[in-house]
Amino acid sequence: MDELKQPPHANRGVVIVKEKNEAVESPLVSMVDYIRVSFKTHDVDRIIEEVLHLSKDFMTEKQSGFYGYVGTYELDYIKVFYSAPDDNRGVLIEMSGQGCRQFESFLECRKKTWYDFFQDCMQQGGSFTRFDLAIDDKKTYFSIPELLKKAQKGECISRFRKSDFNGSFDLSDGITGGTTIYFGSKKSEAYLCFYEKNYEQAEKYNIPLEELGDWNRYELRLKNERAQVAIDALLKTKDLTLIAMQIINNYVRFVDADENITREHWKTSLFWSDFIGDVGRLPLYVKPQKDFYQKSRNWLRNSCAPTMKMVLEADEHLGKTDLSDMIAEAELADKHKKMLDVYMADVADMVV
């Protein structure tokens, strides 16, 4: 397949260094992308302090939750749900991809790793019910639309029985948008998702596609027993990307058709062998994010700032102080006070 790109052969580490000692991301990195772990205890304070190692003083409490939990402590995208005293759900920690990046800033501050967090969870009787691993590929070992065509021709040998895909195109010119391939059912305990991250980010943030360059993302989404098995293996090997490679290789293999032999004996495609080989050599990438509540600031900028500017210009023209008066007279709710505490604190102030 001419359209499937041949992979690079010097993609070995997380960081490469330019001539001026400027560290940049490697074109191929793997990272923890989603965590959900439950504890059969109602001692939410102990879980926050001994598993997350965060000060509850910086967390906002809500008298509501998800998944049947009745309350939530949250620090932006890091969430801790708790159940009613007579409900054996106990406590649940949940971190989205952004939450994982934020939590890495606390791990970095404590000079700890994800493996330390996994170990803390296990020591407190934690049970992992969701664990996602993401691999970002900015060298693009293959074109996902062409990978889809290869799969549709029967050149993908998989333990999954079914696959799904979606995509888009512009009706005015026929130019295609991003393509996503799902291997396995979203309802199953394990499935893979390969998609063109550059298209997703361009649409989400209204960025020209050419500014983002090539960018594929490969996500491994594990639930319940599959998630727990992966964590147990990680604690033994301390090698997240080896586990990722084994999971991908266990479920999906792209091959080159050969009418002279049976399908199960078709040779693995060179691009796929090289991709799997390089993934197996990747260390875990950590990208701590120290900006919290960015969503609130973005909302203020996009939704409120134009109105505030209008009132400010009217004040300046009319000699009034309406805007400054409104700000001075505004009452901060508890959640705003907590957010302000987080804005003004150093990361080290929030860990215990």
UniProtKB/Swiss-Prot annotation:
It comes from the Bacteria. Pfam families: Rep_trans (PF02486), Rol_Rep_N (PF18106). The keyword Metal-binding does not apply. Keywords: Conjugation, DNA integration. InterPro entries: REP-like_C, Rol_Rep_N. Signal peptide: none annotated. One of its GO terms (biological process) is DNA integration. Belongs to the plasmid replication initiation factor family. The oriT nick site is located within the nicK open reading frame. Probable DNA relaxase involved in the transfer of the integrative and conjugative element ICEBs1. Required for the transfer of ICEBs1. Probably mediates conjugation of ICEBs1 by nicking at oriT on the conjugative element and facilitates the translocation of a single strand of ICEBs1 DNA through a transmembrane conjugation pore into the recipient cell. This is Putative DNA relaxase NicK. It comes from Bacillus subtilis (strain 168). The lineage of its organism: Bacteria, Bacillati, Bacillota, Bacilli, Bacillales.
